[in-house]
Every structure is written in C-alpha cells, then in structure tokens.
Amino acid sequence: MGVAKKPDLSDPVSRAKLAKGMGHNYYGEPAWPNDLLYIPPVVIPGTIACTVGLAVLEPSMIGEPANPFATPLEILPEWYFSPVFQILRTVPNKLLGVLLMAAVPAGLLVVPFPENVNKFQNPFRRPVATTVFSAGTAVAPWLGIGAALPIDKSLTLGLF
C-alpha cells in the first residue's frame, strides 16, 4: 500500500495541465508489460548468479571459529548496534541511557507532524526533516565508530 499524492487543484497551472491531460500521468511508458514482465526474469537470475559466483570464487571464512571455552576480553555487539552500545556505555546512569535509547525512535515518530502542513517535496523546503536527517546521519556513524574505541577516546574519536 502506497501513499498517492493528489494534484494541487488550487494552482491554476496544475489545473491547466490536468485539463490538457498533461498532469501527473504525463510521462513514461506503462509498467505492464514492459517493466513487470521483462525485467524480473533477467534481474532475479542475475542476482542469484552473482551471489553463487561470489560464494564459489571466495569461499573464505568470515571470522575465526567460535571457541565455547574461551571468553573474549571485550564483548562488542554487532555493527548495527554500535551507536546504541555507545549511548549505554558513555551515559553514567543506566536508566538515563535506556531512556535516551527510547527517545531516538520516539523522536523519529514525531518528525512528520510539524512537516505535515508543508506541501513541498523539495528537501530544502522541509527544514525540520532535513535537519533531523542530517543530524542523524552525522551522529550515528560518530557513535558507531566511537563504540569500537576505548572508553577514554570514544567521545572524541581520539582526535582531541
């Protein structure tokens, strides 16, 4: 299920284009049968062939074999949990760390509401969403890289 954007009928230019049949359905060719019938039979086997080819040509192990009798000195989470791990590691109060972790998705859920009144799709005309996206794109790698460093260098990434 997708979100369909309705044309802006209050704009006289859009109304004139729609009256001539030149509105939102003006460009391109139909998806059926041109795209949906001919592209997947080529793309799906090609993707499978590339995956199998890489597996056959490079069958090296991903890491060293697991040893259930030896515990590593420092247990690190998977890479996609690194920013969250860094939040928990640097905040001294664990309850505050858990609340900060819960604030991330809660903040992302709030972002669309102030932007809902804005009819523009251009990111430069949607300052709240663009700022939140830019800040998240900058902070997430910073926290992720910092999680792999020792705790005394983790916030500054060893630069200062």
From Swiss-Prot:
> How the protein sits in the membrane?
Multi-pass membrane protein
Please list the GO biological process terms of this entry: mitochondrial electron transport, ubiquinol to cytochrome c; photosynthetic electron transport chain
Query: Which InterPro entries does the UniProt record give?
Result: Cyt_b/b6_C, Cyt_b/b6_C_sf, Cyt_b6/f_cplx_suIV, Cytochrome_b_C_euk/bac
Q: Name one Pfam family in it.
A: Cytochrom_B_C
Q: Does the keyword ATP-binding apply?
A: no
Q: Which Gene3D superfamilies match?
A: plastocyanin oxidoreductase, Single helix bin
Q: Name one GO molecular function term.
A: electron transporter, transferring electrons within cytochrome b6/f complex of photosystem II activity
Q: What is the protein's major site of localization?
A: plastid
Q: Which domain of life is it from?
A: Eukaryota
Annotated membrane-spanning segments are: 36-56, 95-115, 131-151
SUPFAM superfamilies given for it? a domain/subunit of cytochrome bc1 complex (Ubiquinol-cytochrome c reductase)
Q: Which UniProt keywords apply?
A: Chloroplast, Electron transport, Membrane, Photosynthesis, Plastid, Thylakoid, Transmembrane, Transmembrane helix, Transport
Q: Does the keyword Transmembrane helix apply?
A: yes
GO CC terms on record?
chloroplast thylakoid membrane; mitochondrion
Q: Where in the cell is it found?
A: Plastid, Chloroplast thylakoid membrane
Q: Oligomeric state and partners?
A: The 4 large subunits of the cytochrome b6-f complex are cytochrome b6, subunit IV (17 kDa polypeptide, petD), cytochrome f and the Rieske protein, while the 4 small subunits are petG, petL, petM and petN. The complex functions as a dimer.
Q: Which family does it belong to?
A: Belongs to the cytochrome b family. PetD subfamily.
What is the role of this chain?
Component of the cytochrome b6-f complex, which mediates electron transfer between photosystem II (PSII) and photosystem I (PSI), cyclic electron flow around PSI, and state transitions.
Protein known as: Cytochrome b6-f complex subunit 4
Gene that this polypeptide is encoded by:
petD
